[in-house]
Each structure stands twice: as C-alpha cells, then as structure tokens.
Amino acid sequence: MANVTLNVTDNQGKATGTVDAPAEIFGFSAEEVQSRIPLIHQVVIAQLAAARQGTHATKTRGMVSGGGRKPWKQKGTGRARQGSIRAPQWYHGGTVFGPQPRDYSQRTPKKMKAAALKYVLSDRANAGHVAVVDFGVSEAPSTKAAVAALTPVTENKFTTVVLSRENVNEWLSVRNIPTVHPIFADQLNTYDVVTAQYVVFSKEGFDAFLAAKAEPAAKEA
C-alpha cells in the first residue's frame, strides 16, 4: 500500500501543501473497511458499554422499609391472603427482577481496538474527510480564528479535532464550537471517528498521533 496524501490548510482554509500519512493507518481500501464492519461495531459497542456507570439499583421486597408483619390474618376475612405490604403487587412494594449494580465493560484486546481505529480512519480518508489544519492560534486562543480555519475544510459538519497536549491555545479555541469534538492525539478512538463526518488534525496533533502509533510498533519489533 502507498502512503496517503492529506491536504494541509492554513488558518483561512487555503491549501498550503500536503503531508504523507502512513498507509498502514490511513490506506485501507473501501472493500477492506467494509469487510471489517463487524470488528468496528464490536469495538464501538464495547466502548459505549464501558462508559456506563452501572450504578442503577432497585429495591426488592426485602430491601423496602416496612412490611414486617402480616397485614391481616390468613383466613376468615374474605380477602386474598397477604404476607407483607411490601410484596411486589402492593403500592410501594418491592420490585421484581429490577436492575441491580453491575459492570457493563467488555474485554476488548488492544489489537482489536487499534485495528478498528485504522479502518475507520481509512474510511474517512477514502472519502477525503481527513485533513491537517494550521489554526494559527499559537500566541493567543481565538474561537473566531478556529472557525475561520475549519469552515472551508469541514463545511460546518460535525468534526473530531485531534490536538497535541502541548498546544493549549488550540484546545481553548475549538472547545466551544458546537460542531466540534476536541480530543488529544493519544485519546483518539474508533467511536469519536465513527460519529464525526470529518477528522481534522492540528500539525502538532498529527505528529503526536503518529508518534503514539509508532511506539507500540517499535516495542513489537
């Protein structure tokens, strides 16, 4: 596979050049991406499940306060027999088979998560929806400047913006834009790519992302 060429634009949305993106991350074909949809789906579902707190809880008849004595005698009243006013059929009674605290997380191997991210990034790159933008806010944060830089590239569509942790001004500039989800390069994940129509890297964010992906490869080698 050949490296993928991504457009680089300035703070006015004008093209200033290109940058090579590694084929092993951005270069999978549409057919390969299509064949990996079950993998992508599994990783996204696992990520959403892991985000659940799982603190929901209902009270069973044994947990509800009261109901210690039998409301009336077993026989002779003409009414149905009852053992407690906290039985499920009673108003303010306990809940039957209600939700209890649980852990929703699913085991997802690192290689699966890494592979899913590569395929969704390739899908966006194949559509021309991945770009590198110079926001031009290195001296002071400016949301107005960030909007001017992003609009020509993303057409105001929902965008995941990948930033470096070192450049705080870029984060402050884009965090309040309604159509933008900012994320640091080492946190980029499958879900945040799938839910966005465009993926935009800052220059430093792109370098940081590639550096983060190169470290595991170097360890395996």
From Swiss-Prot:
Q: Where is this region: Disordered?
A: 56-83
User: Which keywords are on file for this protein?
Assistant: Ribonucleoprotein, Ribosomal protein, RNA-binding, rRNA-binding
- What is a single molecular function from GO for this protein? rRNA binding
| Matching SUPFAM superfamilies | Ribosomal protein L4
Q: Name one GO cellular component term.
A: ribosome
Q: Which GO terms describe its biological process?
A: translation
Q: What would be one Pfam family of this protein? A: Ribosomal_L4
| Cross-referenced NCBIfam families | rplD_bact (TIGR03953)
Q: How does it assemble?
A: Part of the 50S ribosomal subunit.
**Role, per record:** One of the primary rRNA binding proteins, this protein initially binds near the 5'-end of the 23S rRNA. It is important during the early stages of 50S assembly. It makes multiple contacts with different domains of the 23S rRNA in the assembled 50S subunit and ribosome. Forms part of the polypeptide exit tunnel.
What family name appears in the similarity comment? Belongs to the universal ribosomal protein uL4 family.
Q: What is this protein called?
A: Large ribosomal subunit protein uL4
Q: Which organism is it from?
A: Bifidobacterium adolescentis (strain ATCC 15703 / DSM 20083 / NCTC 11814 / E194a)
> Which gene underlies this protein?
rplD
